[in-house]
Amino acid sequence: MSAFITFEGPEGSGKTTVLQRVSEKLAQDYQLIATREPGGVPTGEEIRKVVLEGANMDIRTEAMLFAASRREHLVEKVVPALNDNKIVLCDRYIDSSLAYQGYARGIGIEEVKQLNDFAINGLYPDLTIYLDITAEVGRDRILKNQRDQNRLDKEDIAFHEKVIEGYRQIIQETPQRFAVVDATRNIDDVVNETYEIILNFLK
């Protein structure tokens, strides 16, 4: 069976770690791929370098680059895997653009949605796991783990609080697609709950 499952959350929420560990557990019983945005394919990785490691840029340029990376990633990796009846686990997708560029940057969620609707051509996730933490907890984790910080990581706390507000608005408008997980807990508990949510969804 095929399923498109995305992982969302603010910086420091543990998305990458949770996705990796959940994918290892699921791989025992399912055919799947784990991937990420921006990136996932060579062209997308090049765009990732520009938007995350480069200098500050116009906010609409930023939004369009994320959408371009998303389109290439879909065409080259996600859609072929779904057509092969695989489960796709993706670290970030359209909701990141809506929360970051649409809400926190102030472009407008609907405006960024229109741009991304063109890019994704109707391919929305079947399920989105949202790892819920506060901006302060996320920042403290990044500093504690001494993680390399990209351009978005370095935004001030007010920006990251807006990102979370954006996510909450998106979840409120489309609750049927989201499963919200308290990511302030021990990582093992977060992984186990996320794994159970996905297992129940796939049954």
UniProtKB/Swiss-Prot annotation:
InterPro entries: P-loop_NTPase, Thymidylate_kin-like_dom, Thymidylate_kin_CS, Thymidylate_kinase. It comes from Staphylococcus haemolyticus (strain JCSC1435). It comes from the Bacteria. SUPFAM superfamilies: P-loop containing nucleoside triphosphate hydrolases. It catalyses: dTMP + ATP = dTDP + ADP. Phosphorylation of dTMP to form dTDP in both de novo and salvage pathways of dTTP synthesis. One of its GO terms (biological process) is dUDP biosynthetic process. PANTHER family: THYMIDYLATE KINASE (PTHR10344), UMP-CMP KINASE 2, MITOCHONDRIAL (PTHR10344:SF4). The keyword Repeat does not apply. It holds the Pfam family Thymidylate_kin. Belongs to the thymidylate kinase family. One of its GO terms (molecular function) is dTMP kinase activity. The lineage of its organism: Bacteria, Bacillati, Bacillota, Bacilli, Bacillales. This is Thymidylate kinase. NCBIfam families: DTMP_kinase. Its EC number is 2.7.4.9. GO terms for cellular component: cytosol. It is an enzyme of class 2 (transferase). Keywords: ATP-binding, Kinase, Nucleotide biosynthesis, Nucleotide-binding, Transferase. The keyword ATP-binding applies. ATP binds at G9, P10, E11, G12, S13, G14, K15, T16.
